[in-house]
Amino acid sequence: MDKKAFELFIDNDKYTWGEDTITGAQLRVLGAIPEGVDIFLKVPGKPDKPIENTTSVNLKEHHGPARFSTQSPGSQAG
């Protein structure tokens, strides 16, 4: 039985993930995001949710691909 692959976006770059959950640490590896750069889960109609290395995101809960953005400390969200 094949596992479902989930599409997700990090700063508009498309990735595929083979598990139904992903952590902030796994997002860093997948998207080559350096430590010190903040990761946020974009939530339509709500403020973006900060994702720590230990935060787990359930990709099955999203309608369509999950969208993440990154932001260097001290910069304004875009």
Kindly give the residue locations of the regions a language model identified:
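Ubiquitin-like/PB1-type beta-grasp interaction modules and other compact soluble beta-rich domains
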Residues: 1-78
